[in-house]
Amino acid sequence: MKLKVLETFVSVQGEGPYQGLPSYFVRCAGCNLNCAWCDTKELLKKPGRDVEVKELVKEAVKALSNGVHHITVTGGEPLLQQEGVNNFISQLLTEVGYTPIVIFTNGTIPLQKECDALWHYPDYVVDVKPPSARVRKPFVFPLTINYMTVHLKTVVTCEEDIYFVDSFIKTYLKNMKLSFIYYVNPTTQHIARKVFKEVLRWNKKYPLLEARMHLQAHKVWGLQ
């Protein structure tokens, strides 16, 4: 089985639950969105290359043996290739047993029931797209599955985006019975001050929600 891949590399994890830790990255080709401020827009124009899953597993195992903490599957949108990603995770688990794996997704692709490893093993960082992304796709990611570790994330560039996050929390998380971490990434100091006030309010109002101000640290450090 093959995955269509744009690149693989080792770098520091810039965001999410494993921020600051070394990771082996698999960047999948293809995306179903075209976000206005996408940071890989030029790269995503490329078709990618077909790579055997067993070769990716071999690279990942080598990286783990050389000090990498976890595996990151990103894009693009990796869930456009669910069968291949599921196969990659399954083969990797067979080789090394437990190792942390995180998948970055935009939350607009339904998980296929037959992809068992995708439901039971990886952590997810779900990038919830605000109005400033200028994309319209329904959010369909299953937030209520109690055996999945899901973290939410939104890049906030303006006040409209803050209102969007507030509305999303009310719509999807108001009656939640599971705890969630929601990373809110303000892009300017002005917006950051406003976001901080809302983070305080959200965390007070929703006991199972842990809203956090967040940033893409790899960009600050000048790393890939």
Predicted features, each with a name:
Residues 17-19, 23, 33, 77-79, ...:
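Short, flexible micro-motifs
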Residues 25, 70-72, 125, 153:
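Short aromatic/hydrophobic contact patches that present stacked aromatics
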Residues 2-37:
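N-terminal pre-triad scaffold of radical SAM enzymes
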Residues 13, 57-61, 170:
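Generic structural signal for well-ordered alpha-helical scaffold segments
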Residues 80-224:
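Conserved AdoMet/S-adenosylmethionine-binding subsite of the radical SAM
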Residues 31-35, 63-66, 141-144, 176-177:
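Short amphipathic alpha-helical segments, especially helix-boundary/capping motifs
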Residues 3-7, 34-122:
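Conserved Radical SAM active-site core
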